Amino acid sequence: MEENNYVIFKKQYGNIKRPRVKELSINLNGVKIYEKEQSMIINIIVPVEDSTKTIQYFEEFNLGEDIQFNIAGTGDFECSFRGISPVIDKNSYSSFSITVQEKEPQDQMKG
């Protein structure tokens, strides 16, 4: 898998002693990101055979839970999960959107 062709979503779980990360990679061609005032809408299109595992991955997030994503190896965006839209199934693909809110960098929050 060529990292530069994918968006990698990351979910942290476990505890401080045993932190774990669950990742999901989606081809860049199937991801479109739109910025709104205080959030981002991420439209996702995946082949129908990948839709179940992809949707299940995002359904595991709770409202406000941390989510990270890395676009083509450019570094992690730290966000809070805000929700998932209904899924639209077509013949060969499924599409849906997730909403995330970018987190404030720690040093900006203090000052």
Question: What residue spans do the PLM features occupy?
Answer:
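Short intrinsically disordered terminal tails
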Residues: 1, 110-111
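Solvent-exposed edge beta-strands and adjacent loop segments
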Residues: 1-41, 74-87
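Short beta-strand and beta-hairpin "edge-sheet" elements
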Residues: 18-19, 66-110
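Oligomerization/assembly interface segments of phage tail-like spikes and tubes
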Residues: 28, 32-52, 91-107
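Short coil-to-beta transition motif at edge beta-strands of beta-rich domains
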Residues: 58-68
